Amino acid sequence: MENTENSVDSKSIKSLEPKIIHGSKSVDSGISLDNSYKMDYPEMGLCIIINNKNFHKSTGMASRSGTDVDAANLRETFINLKYGVRNKNDLTREEIVELMRNVSKEDHSKRSSFVCVLLSHGEEGIIFGTNGPLDLKKITSFFRGDCCRSLTGKPKLFIIQACRGTELDCGIEADSGVEDDMACHKIPVEADFLYAYSTAPGYYSWRNSKDGSWFIQSLCAMLKQYADKLEFMHILTRVNRKVATEFESFSLDATFHAKKQIPCIVSMLTKELYFYH
């Protein structure tokens, strides 16, 4: 890879306190007892790509060079997977909330799944609108089982390219379905979410000014190669390995030079996810 300088997607900010949510809802349909999600609805689903590159001067946050490469790569990748892709650029935190609220109110009954990609600066539990921070939980809560009924029991994938802190990883040398007939099931409202983070909790996330972020480059490459062959968690494991072994930061600042990164998968999926059927 060409030695263009790498940047990180971070802006220091006090973390928000997590909220505790109780309760669950019964669902009337769309739940399969098979081991894999039903992906043969008339539509694969929506893929919302929020690409925040330029930030208000008052935030003190730098422009995210290379992010447009990520957005274009993601668009091509998910169109090839038959998703309806909607790209949104430079949204404020209020605009992000409004967009997510409106999308959650759409009828997803003929859609197999939902994907949301967030490209921005971040901290642990935080994504940045162009004018300031937004709690990730605020975004994802619109799609909980008790809030977005037409996506209940369907996979909801959130892909997040952003920093989760300010730690640096120096690295270490190493040797080398079918729906059932039951009328009602009760499932947790937080079930069927998957969060694919670009980096581990507390760490910087790297982005190349020319080629885009390490994580999104790798995710798109692995989806293009394996989406018609492997289950999604297996694909993400290959993404982890690619990022961990094939990338190392290049920076004119010695503090940020020769650093490593490992993505992080947080899954509440209840079945296997295949993009083919």
From Swiss-Prot:
Subcellular location: Cytoplasm
Family to which the UniProt record says this protein belongs: Belongs to the peptidase C14A family.
Key words of the record: Acetylation, Apoptosis, Cytoplasm, Hydrolase, Phosphoprotein, Protease, S-nitrosylation, Thiol protease, Ubl conjugation, Zymogen
Phosphoserine modification, residue list: S26
SMART domains: CASc
Statement: the UniProt record of this protein carries the keyword Nucleotidyltransferase: no
Activity regulation remarks: Inhibited by BIRC6; following inhibition of BIRC6-caspase binding by DIABLO/SMAC, BIRC6 is subjected to caspase cleavage, leading to an increase in active caspases.
Propeptide feature: residues: 1-9, 10-28
GO biological process, one term: apoptotic process
Catalytic activity: Strict requirement for an Asp residue at positions P1 and P4. It has a preferred cleavage sequence of Asp-Xaa-Xaa-Asp-|- with a hydrophobic amino-acid residue at P2 and a hydrophilic amino-acid residue at P3, although Val or Ala are also accepted at this position
Protein name: Caspase-3
One Gene Ontology cellular component annotation held by this UniProt entry: cytoplasm
Record InterPro entries: Caspase-like_dom_sf (IPR029030), Caspase_cys_AS (IPR033139), Caspase_his_AS (IPR016129), Pept_C14 (IPR002398), Pept_C14_caspase (IPR011600), Pept_C14_p10 (IPR002138), Pept_C14_p20 (IPR001309), Pept_C14A (IPR015917)
Record GO terms (molecular function): cysteine-type endopeptidase activity; endopeptidase activity
Residues the record lists as N-acetylmethionine modifications: M1
Post-translational modification: Cleavage by granzyme B, caspase-6, caspase-8 and caspase-10 generates the two active subunits. Additional processing of the propeptides is likely due to the autocatalytic activity of the activated protease. Active heterodimers between the small subunit of caspase-7 protease and the large subunit of caspase-3 also occur and vice versa. S-nitrosylated on its catalytic site cysteine in unstimulated cell lines and denitrosylated upon activation of the Fas apoptotic pathway, associated with an increase in intracellular caspase activity. Fas therefore activates caspase-3 not only by inducing the cleavage of the caspase zymogen to its active subunits, but also by stimulating the denitrosylation of its active site thiol.
Entry superkingdom: Eukaryota
Active site residues of this protein: H121, C163
Subunit details: Heterotetramer that consists of two anti-parallel arranged heterodimers, each one formed by a 17 kDa (p17) and a 12 kDa (p12) subunit. Interacts with BIRC6/bruce.
